Amino acid sequence: GGRVVFGIGAGWVAAESAVLGVPFAERGAMTDEHLEAMQELWTNPAPSFSGKYTQFSGLKFEPKPVQKPHPPIWVGGHSKAALRRTVQFGAAWHPINRSPEELRAGQAELARLSQARGRAVPPAITLRNDVRIVGPGQAVPASTHGGRVIAGEPARLIEQISELAECGVEHLVLEFLSEDGRELDEQMAAFAERV
């Protein structure tokens, strides 16, 4: 037990918010409030909460998480609001496809925000990144999320991942870019064997 990570992001696609009937401009405030509500549910034996978007009382929320006080929260995004949210609520900042330069800048901002908030230890840095093993002369596919793709021959991937570790990335969540299931299996097997 105790291996759950709670990942959350405010979202960045306005059309998704529209389908759900959620005002896109309020997504950050809603995310903050929902994080407060989740912490109340996780930690209080008789939880109650009264906010703009969420209200509850007189309920039982069981079982409580194995991790205390609650599962680690990884906050997605790379905006200033996401960094602020990470310092306020998160155990880790979890952006997608960021370059080493962007990660270093984010790390510096997390340290600044943590100090301003009186947080002794800044959040960890985790990263979700697209990855693709390619041979000489092969094109690197574009990411559906934009940003940097970890790509190249296995030795080049090792260099890129090492550079991310030097930037403070503690966990790397990979999404293999592939055309189909067969190619996905090949990419993952090659990565496991050679990277």
Feature annotation, model-predicted:
Residues 1-195:
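Active-site-adjacent structural elements that line small-molecule/cofactor binding pockets in enzymes
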